[in-house]
Amino acid sequence: MTLWINGDWITGQGERRRKTNPVSAEILWQGNDANAAQVAEACQAARAAFPRWARQPFTARQAIVQKFAALLEAHKADLTEVIARETGKPRWEAATEVTAMINKIAISIKAYHARTGEQKSELVDGAATLRHRPHGVLAVFGPYNFPGHLPNGHIVSALLAGNTLIFKPSELTPWTGETVIKLWERAGLPAGVLNLVQGGRETGQALSSLDDLDGLLFTGSASTGYQLHRQLSGQPEKILALEMGGNNPLIIEDVANIDAAVHLTLQSAFITAGQRCTCARRLLVKQGAQVDAFLARLVDVAGRLQPGRWDDDPQSFIGGLISAQAAQHVMEAWRQREALGGRTLLASRKVKEGTSLLTPGIIELTGVADVPDEEVFGPLLNVWRYAHFDEAIRLANNTRFGLSCGLVSTDRAQFEQLLLEARAGIVNWNKPLTGAASTAPFGGVGASGNHRPSAWYAADYCAWPMASLESPELTLPATLSPGLDFSRREAV
């Protein structure tokens, strides 16, 4: 029984599915997808639960969310292992994901009050009050790269605001989704407030096409995000929050400290085996002998990165990709760029056939035409050389995406120029592109999405503002508008 609908665990009636470890092929989870009728049933349960949940005092909703946080802390080691085994990422990184889930809850509670709480302004004859109300029934689509942390950012904020939810994890991480939902169950969520439907494309399409849905919160690829946007077009009454991918540029202008610049580049491009939406995909380096030394050192250090199993001891910096198919896709993208005329600086290599273990690849594309503007979700870094900083910014903006952008430079003026001219939601200076804070907005523009799914800014799309002018009594104004005559006529 792998679906949780209206407080009950039930068996899916859709396609049979199993999840294996992407390196060892060990079977981790087996179950059936939700079919269209079960997806509709989950929505009906959420709709029925909404009025009572929305009317709960905020303190009651907060208490359940805080109990969930305590359960995350108590089961941190278990959830860490589930995430690591299912995604293939090293244990150390899976542990940081669970920590981020825990920390995000306190921040989300503060964000609710700061961004969507109640604000009152006194007027001469009453008050003006701003309140926020939940949308209703929302769908949450989770990604596979951070299957606990990223859906958590949507779910916690939406529940605090008083919404009820249907959660569909990625079909590549059903075990993590189920494990997290079981903690919510133990936290005491009332039946129907949060529902779990497992499945792939068919389940997702059934969920996003429901008429009774008030909105959809999505983290994932641009292609799926665009499909959802088209599906919900012409329905302005539904909230649609999209956090999608990026073809992110990292500009290396000044490499006086070569090892520091190499470390920042490795963290930007290859952490999580390149499976972060903010990862650097394009490395823009200034022409000259200094950058030649930097690239040589980058190739040297990156060439020593050996992806390992989730439980290797000592632990590796990167693990496997989400699947052997994902690793193959990265290899094909590298070969495609070679065929276009790219010069390989570091060749990607499969550590073992049939697994998702893939070493990083670096390829130079200076002067190469017709390079696809796409997000290759894995450890592949494309290099371009530029002559001057204005050209670097032009290259950085030469993408339909607009998620993250970074600059390595000692010149503050260059960073100020980048802030003015970069088309990206995240612009970092001498910091990895993959660095983010839950108290800051996370997201981008263009093909990278619209709203900002972080703990702080998620509050914005989980509730709508209601403005009120209020007075405890009704009185006639002392001064009337022109043309109004309230004088009393004497009876004849």
From Swiss-Prot:
Protein keywords: Arginine metabolism, NAD, Oxidoreductase
Classification via HAMAP family: Aldedh_AstD
Organism per entry: Salmonella paratyphi A (strain AKU_12601)
Official protein name in the record: N-succinylglutamate 5-semialdehyde dehydrogenase
Residues noted as binding NAD(+) in the record, renumbered to the chain: 220-225
Pfam (any one): Aldedh
Coiled-coil residue windows: none
EC number(s) reported in the record: 1.2.1.71
